[in-house]
Amino acid sequence: HLVESKGGAIACMFLALFFLGTWPALLTMLERRGRLPQHTYLDYSITNFFAALLIAFTFGEIGKGKPDEPNFLAQLAQDNWPSVLFAMGGGVVLSLGNLSSQYAFAFVGLSVTEVITASITVVIGTTLNYFLDDKINKAEILFPGVGCFLIAVFLGFCRFNSSNASDNKAKLSNYTSDYKEVAISSKESDLVKSKDLERGSSSADNVEAGTAVFLLELEERRAIKVFGKSTLIGLALTFSAGLCFSMFSPAFNLATNDQWHTLPNGIPHLTVYTAFFYFSISCFVIAIILNITFLYHPVLNLPKSSLKAYLADSDGRIWALLAGLLCGFGNSLQFMGGQAAGYQQQSLCRHFLCKHFWGVLLFGEYRRSSRKTYIC
């Protein structure tokens, strides 16, 4: 069953906005509560792939297949490997982008990371899809808007980054050393109380967000330690993620529409469900390989882990599994909408506002910051 109406496409995209805007908040929550990102991402990857299988075997098999739109299982046996490779390439870059952004969240925050990655995705992804979709929209309207969007966000980020760093430095410098010792000495009891990640909370949960006490408690508890590290690390990760995100939609576009005519004569284009299946396979494989590697060879001074430790780490697993489902269903919905309305619209329909909302509401980003930071 394919979405063909504009109304159905819009509904898919709006639902995708919520799903894709929510799952990063769950990963951020777990990292801030001390769960290793490798463990979280492995759980997330499993249900993300499960969502793709569920979509393929349900929506991909509904209705009677047509010669130019075969059902999912029928299409698996066809000679469509050029399109399959495009779909799998899209899955690889999406997996790399998601992995980079997971670490960037710790350095520059959920809201800032998503604004920057979304702006890069809009500019590059929309430009590529504009040419792939045979220039169906007016370039003189499309490109000045997305270009100005990127410039404004980049300049705003640079100003915010400098101002926010100054805010945090001022908060910590005004925090007396005696008070630090008292706060840190009480941390062990706080950690015991927060062992249950679904219900537990430490003192950092009860301290007002944005204060020096909050920053110190959060740093002590979180998995990725950021004190003493440059925010340029987060900036580099953010831009890497944005470049990866900007490529997966054009790759998926090529997989489903074959604009470069790589398929043999008589072979139908991949349906969105078949393409998403192959897309998710490569996304899953890359995620598993990299995160198992990171268990034994961690990055950013994270502690070493193992498969045995991962399997035993059930704290917060339900949230990581939920994040994978939200991402998997969200991606399928945005691709279904993009197939009907055009992948330019799908690239423009970004979900950073939802993520920005969660960053401010759940994690207190920008709380008790200076007027300069709020203006940025």
UniProtKB/Swiss-Prot annotation:
<feature type="transmembrane region" description="Helical">
    <location>
        <begin position="81"/>
        <end position="101"/>
    </location>
</feature>
<feature type="binding site">
    <location>
        <begin position="223"/>
        <end position="230"/>
    </location>
    <ligand>
        <name>ATP</name>
    </ligand>
</feature>
<feature type="topological domain" description="Cytoplasmic">
    <location>
        <begin position="159"/>
        <end position="231"/>
    </location>
</feature>
<dbReference type="Pfam" id="PF07168">
    <property type="entry name" value="Ureide_permease"/>
</dbReference>
<feature type="topological domain" description="Extracellular">
    <location>
        <begin position="125"/>
        <end position="137"/>
    </location>
</feature>
<feature type="transmembrane region" description="Helical">
    <location>
        <begin position="10"/>
        <end position="30"/>
    </location>
</feature>
<feature type="topological domain" description="Extracellular">
    <location>
        <begin position="253"/>
        <end position="274"/>
    </location>
</feature>
<dbReference type="GO" id="GO:0016020">
    <property type="term" value="C:membrane"/>
</dbReference>
<feature type="topological domain" description="Extracellular">
    <location>
        <begin position="1"/>
        <end position="9"/>
    </location>
</feature>
<feature type="topological domain" description="Cytoplasmic">
    <location>
        <begin position="31"/>
        <end position="41"/>
    </location>
</feature>
<keyword id="KW-0547">Nucleotide-binding</keyword>
<dbReference type="GO" id="GO:0005274">
    <property type="term" value="F:allantoin:proton symporter activity"/>
</dbReference>
<feature type="transmembrane region" description="Helical">
    <location>
        <begin position="138"/>
        <end position="158"/>
    </location>
</feature>
<keyword id="KW-0813">Transport</keyword>
<feature type="transmembrane region" description="Helical">
    <location>
        <begin position="318"/>
        <end position="338"/>
    </location>
</feature>
<protein>
    <recommendedName>
        <fullName>Probable ureide permease A3</fullName>
    </recommendedName>
</protein>
<feature type="topological domain" description="Extracellular">
    <location>
        <begin position="339"/>
        <end position="376"/>
    </location>
</feature>
<keyword id="KW-0067">ATP-binding</keyword>
<comment type="similarity">
    <text>Belongs to the plant ureide permease (TC 2.A.7.19) family.</text>
</comment>
<feature type="transmembrane region" description="Helical">
    <location>
        <begin position="275"/>
        <end position="295"/>
    </location>
</feature>
<dbReference type="InterPro" id="IPR009834">
    <property type="entry name" value="Ureide_permease"/>
</dbReference>
<keyword id="KW-0472">Membrane</keyword>
<dbReference type="GO" id="GO:0005524">
    <property type="term" value="F:ATP binding"/>
</dbReference>
<feature type="transmembrane region" description="Helical">
    <location>
        <begin position="232"/>
        <end position="252"/>
    </location>
</feature>
<feature type="topological domain" description="Cytoplasmic">
    <location>
        <begin position="296"/>
        <end position="317"/>
    </location>
</feature>
<dbReference type="GO" id="GO:0015505">
    <property type="term" value="F:uracil:monoatomic cation symporter activity"/>
</dbReference>
<feature type="transmembrane region" description="Helical">
    <location>
        <begin position="42"/>
        <end position="62"/>
    </location>
</feature>
<keyword id="KW-0812">Transmembrane</keyword>
<feature type="topological domain" description="Cytoplasmic">
    <location>
        <begin position="102"/>
        <end position="103"/>
    </location>
</feature>
<feature type="transmembrane region" description="Helical">
    <location>
        <begin position="104"/>
        <end position="124"/>
    </location>
</feature>
<feature type="topological domain" description="Extracellular">
    <location>
        <begin position="63"/>
        <end position="80"/>
    </location>
</feature>
<comment type="function">
    <text>Transports a wide spectrum of oxo derivatives of heterocyclic nitrogen compounds.</text>
</comment>
<keyword id="KW-1133">Transmembrane helix</keyword>
<dbReference type="InterPro" id="IPR030189">
    <property type="entry name" value="UPS_plant"/>
</dbReference>
